[in-house]
């Protein structure tokens, strides 16, 4: 349920509204606007009569939210969320942020070389995988902590904030200390213990869409993170699996306007997983 107040509602009245609903066992989020304020209620609101809420002279409107996601819902938060990472803003009307770097971190020298190249090319962030989710158990699984430290050294040399994928709760402390944006990959989007865990982190979370997940399922994964207290979530469209075999994945660009309509969260696009080869990616 969403409650909008009239312009000029006093703070004492806002506090009274919050106390009233919290005493009914609901979670209340207050979003302050320029002209009015919005309350987002999460919990069982079926017993709350709209006419009783509207009886308050300071209440302008009451809306019931049918979508299963609440905190990520644009109705709860009309203004775009802007995530600030070391002074670089992502979302809203901010300039487009570019994240680039090696798929896998392969050593200090190589990582530093890549960092300098992507910075020269205009990138704002250095991304690199220290822990790699692989389809085959025989493929390179990443350098682990050594790779994270290589990224840190590259950040010190170039000033680029780093983005890297977290695959296991056991590494949360390491990522909290060293990584600027923590990525949850496509394969772990619905590994809900991980979104729950990063909801307690103090770093922005980059949440990739799963290989075969609907937009609603994707947003619900973000809801897990936000329900844990971390509202700095960035969504990433990276392509989904379809009947098409000429490409690795089908990049669903139509998801971008849908996400911007349904949620207030920033969204970025990863074009690297669609083309079938590196040469095709270069051509794109």
Task: List each model region and its residues.
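Catalytic beta/alpha-barrel core
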Residues: 6, 143, 159-170, 180-192, ...
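Active-site mouth loops of central-metabolism enzymes
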Residues: 8, 95-113, 137-141, 161-165, ...
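Short acidic amphipathic segments
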Residues: 50-65
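N-terminal amphipathic alpha-helix/helix-capping segment at the start of soluble metabolic enzymes
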Residues: 67-99
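Catalytic alpha/beta core domains of metabolic enzymes, predominantly
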Residues: 85, 201-284
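Short, well-ordered coil/turn segments that N-cap beta-strands
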Residues: 94-96, 122-124, 156-162, 178-180, ...
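Glycine-rich, proline-tolerant flexible connector loops at the mouths of alpha/beta enzymes
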Residues: 127-145
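Alpha-helix-loop-beta-strand connector modules within alpha/beta enzyme cores
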Residues: 140-164, 197-204, 253-268
């Amino acid at each position: 349920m969403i409650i909008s107040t009239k312009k000029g509602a006093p703070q004492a009245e806002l506090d009274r509204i919050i106390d009233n609903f919290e005493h009914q066992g609901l979670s209340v989020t207050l979003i302050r606007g320029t002209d009015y304020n919005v309350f987002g209620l999460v919990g069982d609101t079926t017993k709350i009569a709209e006419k009783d809420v509207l009886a308050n002279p300071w209440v302008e409107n009451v809306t019931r939210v049918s979508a299963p996601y609440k905190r990520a819902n644009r109705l709860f938060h009309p203004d775009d969320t802007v995530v600030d990472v070391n002074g670089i803003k992502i979302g809203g009307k901010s300039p487009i942020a570019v994240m680039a770097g090696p798929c896998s971190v392969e050593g200090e020298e190589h990582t530093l070389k890549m960092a300098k190249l992507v910075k020269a090319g205009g990138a704002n962030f250095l991304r690199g995988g220290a822990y790699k989710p692989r389809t085959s158990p025989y493929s390179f699984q990443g350098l682990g902590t050594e790779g994270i430290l290589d990224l840190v050294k590259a950040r010190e040399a170039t000033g680029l904030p780093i983005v890297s994928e977290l695959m296991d709760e056991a590494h949360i402390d390491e990522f909290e200390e060293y990584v600027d944006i923590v990525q949850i990959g496509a394969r772990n989007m619905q590994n809900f213990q991980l979104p729950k865990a990063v909801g307690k982190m103090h770093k922005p979370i980059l949440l990739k869409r799963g290989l075969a997940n609907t937009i609603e399922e994707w947003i619900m994964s973000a809801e897990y993170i936000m329900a844990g207290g971390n509202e700095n979530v960035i969504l990433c469209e990276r392509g989904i699996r379809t009947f098409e075999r000429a490409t690795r994945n089908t990049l669903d660009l139509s998801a971008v306007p849908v996400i911007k309509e349904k949620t207030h969260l920033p969204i970025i696009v990863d074009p690297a997983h669609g083309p079938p080869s590196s040469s095709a990616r270069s051509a794109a």
